[in-house]
Amino acid sequence: MQFKRSIVVSCPVDKAFDYVSDWQNLKSFLSNILDITPISFVQYGPGAAFDTVFKVGGANIPTTLDVQEFVRDQRLILRSRHGLKVIGGWEFKPIGSGTSITFSLQYDLPPGLVRTAKDKELIEKDFSDAASQSLQLLKWVLESPTIRDRE
């Protein structure tokens, strides 16, 4: 399953990228990540890896994520190595003094989590709603004077 969502924020691309690419900020705008802990010596950029706990439906699923692609001020892509099977991330494009941020995610649900078509529908809606909510939270954070006006 996959989806893509975009939003435009009134924040320079470098500040938007810096905020999103700092693992310590992910829980502030990704509502379906309950916990995240670095497990690699490198904690920023290529080579960084994190143990996370995703909330999917009613289940908490431990998942290890690796930074697969890191292009400063352009793209951050994460891929799971175990747990929930996911690949996704953010693309950043400057638009005037603001930034267009696109979040995309491809995922496969673990066996046993989906028993009926209704389960699948509810989980897909949960992921979609979480992505939309996350982008709105991210917009709110990035447009706050604390982030936007930081030198």
Task: Name each region found by the language model.
Residues 1, 11, 52, 77, ...:
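Residue-level detector of alpha-helix boundaries and kinks
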Residues 9, 54, 105-107:
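Hydrophobic beta-strand positions in extracellular immunoglobulin-like domains
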Residues 1-40, 45:
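Hydrophobic ligand-binding cavity/cleft-lining segments
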